[in-house]
Amino acid sequence: MPPSAPDDDRDAPAPPHPQIGAYLDALKFERKLSQHTLASYARELAVLQQLGARFAAGIDLMRLQPHHIRRMMAQLHGGGLSGRSIARALSAWRGWYQWLALRDAAVTANPVDGIRAPKSPKRLPKALSVEQAVALMEQLPGDDPEAVRDRAVNELFYSCGLRLSELVGLDLRHAQAGDYASASWLDLEAREVTVLGKGNKRRTVPVGSKAAEALAAWLAVRPQLAQPDAAPEDAHALFLSARGKRLAQRQIQTRMKRNAIAAGVPADVHPHVLRHSFATHMLQSSGDLRAVQELLGHASIASTQVYTSLDFQHLAKIYDQAHPRAKKK
């Protein structure tokens, strides 16, 4: 685990505060925490003690106030520590003060309560360029049933922005027989898929013409992989493995990565990259955030807004390349 403070905050560490040692013993013998977790707590509390000596000199740690904690947090943040790491430190400190309050009447308030770590910047999802996406769709080698299936899988991911779990759950068509009922299905004639997404929310997504062509080609060879005595879960599955079983998530991930390399796509390609690429390219083309939200099945528009950052990056790049006053001399 990386340290929770810059190196200069860890030089010449002072002996542990007696109550910190007692707290670590309680974590070890009463809560039976692992050595790894104990070491993490010890590091975070050592940082508290070192920063306390700097920003609250002459004040016992047990008497620190919220403004002391905020100054310490600002020091950690200014030293380049991530919001997640600061949150971990605050959690350890908060736990120590809670423990103290149960044992020392003089500790009447927890100075860490109500203090939150700064938010770390959201990691933007990776997306293929349009050229890379086209290469992945059009340059997959082979014409055996598995290769034809893989092209249909890729086209459907990119056309509909489906989650991996949604795609593997697709049936050939809506089916209900005995105890079996389709949760998600393809309607190729209507050129749409109906999927059961997160939170058991069902949505219908249109299928593009290229994906429809790839699906028709796959359906023509699918009988070569189908098994006559298959269980309903496999018999109704849209995508089958070489053994006639419903195609598994791991199989899709492995083959997609291998096919991407064969197509000369340098990015680390996996199903979610195609979902991100779908969203990014749709937003760049339409600018309709609400429509992209509906297509992706996001419950909140906030989940979709991350793609506006990607769109701005795209626009900024085009500006830098095209605007005569933006070009570097």
Swiss-Prot record:
<dbReference type="GO" id="GO:0005737">
    <property type="term" value="C:cytoplasm"/>
</dbReference>
<dbReference type="InterPro" id="IPR011931">
    <property type="entry name" value="Recomb_XerC"/>
</dbReference>
<dbReference type="InterPro" id="IPR004107">
    <property type="entry name" value="Integrase_SAM-like_N"/>
</dbReference>
<dbReference type="InterPro" id="IPR013762">
    <property type="entry name" value="Integrase-like_cat_sf"/>
</dbReference>
<keyword id="KW-0159">Chromosome partition</keyword>
<keyword id="KW-0131">Cell cycle</keyword>
<dbReference type="GO" id="GO:0007059">
    <property type="term" value="P:chromosome segregation"/>
</dbReference>
<dbReference type="InterPro" id="IPR023009">
    <property type="entry name" value="Tyrosine_recombinase_XerC/XerD"/>
</dbReference>
<dbReference type="InterPro" id="IPR010998">
    <property type="entry name" value="Integrase_recombinase_N"/>
</dbReference>
<feature type="active site">
    <location>
        <position position="272"/>
    </location>
</feature>
<dbReference type="InterPro" id="IPR002104">
    <property type="entry name" value="Integrase_catalytic"/>
</dbReference>
<feature type="active site">
    <location>
        <position position="298"/>
    </location>
</feature>
<keyword id="KW-0233">DNA recombination</keyword>
<dbReference type="InterPro" id="IPR044068">
    <property type="entry name" value="CB"/>
</dbReference>
<feature type="active site">
    <location>
        <position position="198"/>
    </location>
</feature>
<feature type="active site">
    <location>
        <position position="275"/>
    </location>
</feature>
<protein>
    <recommendedName>
        <fullName>Tyrosine recombinase XerC 1</fullName>
    </recommendedName>
</protein>
<dbReference type="GO" id="GO:0051301">
    <property type="term" value="P:cell division"/>
</dbReference>
<dbReference type="InterPro" id="IPR050090">
    <property type="entry name" value="Tyrosine_recombinase_XerCD"/>
</dbReference>
<comment type="function">
    <text>Site-specific tyrosine recombinase, which acts by catalyzing the cutting and rejoining of the recombining DNA molecules. The XerC-XerD complex is essential to convert dimers of the bacterial chromosome into monomers to permit their segregation at cell division. It also contributes to the segregational stability of plasmids.</text>
</comment>
<keyword id="KW-0963">Cytoplasm</keyword>
<keyword id="KW-0238">DNA-binding</keyword>
<feature type="active site" description="O-(3'-phospho-DNA)-tyrosine intermediate">
    <location>
        <position position="307"/>
    </location>
</feature>
<dbReference type="Pfam" id="PF02899">
    <property type="entry name" value="Phage_int_SAM_1"/>
</dbReference>
<dbReference type="GO" id="GO:0006313">
    <property type="term" value="P:DNA transposition"/>
</dbReference>
<comment type="similarity">
    <text>Belongs to the 'phage' integrase family. XerC subfamily.</text>
</comment>
<feature type="domain" description="Core-binding (CB)">
    <location>
        <begin position="14"/>
        <end position="101"/>
    </location>
</feature>
<feature type="active site">
    <location>
        <position position="163"/>
    </location>
</feature>
<dbReference type="GO" id="GO:0009037">
    <property type="term" value="F:tyrosine-based site-specific recombinase activity"/>
</dbReference>
<keyword id="KW-0229">DNA integration</keyword>
<dbReference type="Pfam" id="PF00589">
    <property type="entry name" value="Phage_integrase"/>
</dbReference>
<comment type="subunit">
    <text>Forms a cyclic heterotetrameric complex composed of two molecules of XerC and two molecules of XerD.</text>
</comment>
<feature type="domain" description="Tyr recombinase">
    <location>
        <begin position="123"/>
        <end position="320"/>
    </location>
</feature>
<keyword id="KW-0132">Cell division</keyword>
<dbReference type="GO" id="GO:0003677">
    <property type="term" value="F:DNA binding"/>
</dbReference>
<dbReference type="InterPro" id="IPR011010">
    <property type="entry name" value="DNA_brk_join_enz"/>
</dbReference>
